[in-house]
């Protein structure tokens, strides 16, 4: 009888790994008769499961236990183990030059990677996201966003601004297949992003919005997204403060980013953008901290004049010299990194 009860308890907790359980619930779920020896005998079984590291007491002496998720060792050098190549993610291009953002040649993207894009409000996050979508359209990417759709009569439809941008980009991007069906999937998602990730696909999220008192949750949100990617990758846009050195969420964002890019204003023209390579876990050249400038044209659809820039050697990035606007950098604080 005791062994039979033990088997029942083990089978039950096996089904609820990662959750919590208490003695009373176990008795109820297993329909144990209060007058039977099993009523108290279940405590012996629980004690045994604690010793076997199947259950863990809460520590509050309240009879609550966490069911520990069981794992098996992973053999690394298994005969015939496949070596997966880098993920062939195409970065946005300079429309006029036809070349991908030059730093992308020095970044290695792997399956399951997460690219975060921290951008100041109205500084081109959507432009970068849509260009990622366009460059990888033949891989049938997934696009989620809180400004791409609008609710009309109980049904989500593409927002006017979004479809206008796609119409402009259709001059150089084939958004549909031969049968007229979308070559990408648009999901009207504004929360619970991880639950809607499409495994083994490029998932582009523009953008994740969290309340100010929830920014510490961003690490968990990004971790959950990564866990669902399979052999796909994610590109996630996040808001960034004007003078901050990272996306909102700070270190929590950096902890889970395989590549971290930042977007700021470059000049008094709101369509001039400064891109900083803040982080990259796998790279083939020293690119961290490098900065690039470009302009956005044609209603936020094209990236042009993409080039590397460095801090102005005359004003040291301060935009002014001797109380006057710096002529060398035209009051941007930056200068094109021209080859010698």
Question: What are these model-derived regions, one by one?
Answer:
Residues 117-118, 122, 216-314, 318, ...:
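Phosphate-binding/switch region of NTP-binding enzymes
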Residues 50-60:
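A short, conserved structural fragment
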Residues 74-103:
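N-terminal pre-Walker A segment at the start of P-loop NTPase domains
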Residues 4-7, 16-17, 105-110, 119-120, ...:
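Conserved inter-motif catalytic segment of the P-loop NTP-binding fold
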Residues 128:
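Hydrophobic positions on the alpha1 helix immediately C-terminal to the Walker A/P-loop
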Residues 18-33:
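Short acidic, hydrophobic short linear motifs in intrinsically disordered regions
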Residues 60-81:
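Short, cationic-aromatic polyanion-contact patches
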Residues 36-48:
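Short amphipathic alpha-helical interaction segments
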